[in-house]
Each structure stands twice: as structure tokens, then as C-alpha cells.
Amino acid sequence: MIDNSHLTEHGIKYLTMISKQFVLITSNLKHPAFRVKADNMHIIYQDKLNLRNALTQLKCQYGCERITIQTGGTLNAMFLREKLLDYVDVVIAPVLIGGKETSTLIDGESLTTMDDLKKLGVLQLESCETLKHSYIRLRYKVIR
């Protein structure tokens, strides 16, 4: 899990209770996880978040071969722009939400040049599935 400020000490304890192994990646030296003692908790501290390095550590130190990312637009953008995604799985809800301050699927800095566009992966639709209550699931392969 990547977190700097959202998890509480209670939340960390809960996650360690329900997890076989729990790995936290943070750049916050005052993160509440540092106060929790749990044999199955591991903390990867980075001065500044480096996703590629964090993924390498997860693989080399903990044997992690595959991860699922369920995050907000800022981290989504970081993973996409660093070309760290193989697949994108999106579930669309039957509601329209918006506004100037509303987070989107991909947040972060605006793309303003052709070089910025090259940082993105092109998506190839692999499947489209209608779910209950008018939800739609789209699965894409990221083409590099």
C-alpha cells in the first residue's frame, strides 16, 4: 500500500490483522505505521516516492510478481506516465460527477506538449462487460 497521510494507527493495525503480509510504501517519517509493531508489516521508506524503485523492492524483497492498483487520479497518472501499467480495468458507474476540484481517473500535471503525450500508453480494448445495476467494466491492455 502507498500512503503518506490517509491511514490512521487503527487502520494500520486492522490491515496487519487481515493481511498475511502487509507492505507500506511511504515518504512520511511521521506516518502512524512507524508506531505499530506487527511481525507481518514491512515499511519501505523513500524520501520522495519512486514507483519504479518501489516495485523493484516489492519484487526483490517480498517476491511480489503482480499488484492491483486501486487508487486515485494522482497515483494513476504517475503509474501511467512511468509506463508501469500492463492492464487498465475500469468500472463505470451510471452517474455523472464533475467540477473544478473533482478528482478524475487521471489527475496530475496537465499534458501540454507532444512529448507529454508520448509518456502515455495507448489502450487496446480487451473486453467490455455489463454488470449489475447498469455498471460497465472495461478491460484494456496498455500498448507501449
Predicted feature locations:
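Enzymes that bind and transform nitrogen-containing heteroaromatic metabolites
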Residues: M1-R144
